[in-house]
């Protein structure tokens, strides 16, 4: 295992000889109190969409995660896993730079283990992104 270039409260798992992951971790080892967040979409606390824009929904979705973490006494630095579900791979790829900026704005320079999955649709018809999160407090 080698140390990844980003700082984290948990141990980043990168096998020797592997090219470092960019924007995520290959694996994370953590122990402590675990918080499991259900699928979070890009609507506000009143369950209303303020935008149909992919980036705006992503920002709101990430902020929703931060808000739920705070209730559990955690912050973005405690995240160990994010699973993203998106409805449009092409839009994601075309707007990757904006996605990165929004991620860093809300979450910071913390990159847990992540997976990104394209789905045909999400349960809320206006939703373009949904994220499940797991966090561990030491």
Where would I find each of the regions flagged by the language model?
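N-terminal presequence-like segments and the immediate start of the first folded domain
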Residues: 1-80, 86-138
């Amino acid at each position: 295992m080698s140390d990844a270039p980003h700082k984290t409260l948990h141990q980043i798992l990168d096998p020797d000889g592997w090219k470092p992951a960019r924007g995520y971790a290959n694996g994370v080892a953590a122990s402590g109190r675990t918080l499991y967040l259900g699928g979070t979409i890009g609507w506000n606390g009143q369950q209303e969409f303020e935008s149909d824009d992919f980036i705006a929904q992503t920002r709101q979705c990430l902020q929703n995660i931060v808000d739920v973490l705070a209730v559990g006494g955690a912050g973005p630095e405690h995240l160990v896993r994010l699973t993203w579900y998106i409805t449009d791979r092409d839009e994601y790829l075309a707007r990757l730079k904006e996605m990165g900026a929004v991620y860093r704005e809300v979450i910071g320079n913390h990159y847990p283990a992540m997976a990104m999955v394209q789905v045909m649709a999400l349960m809320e018809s206006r939703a373009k992104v949904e994220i499940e999160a797991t966090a561990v407090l030491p």
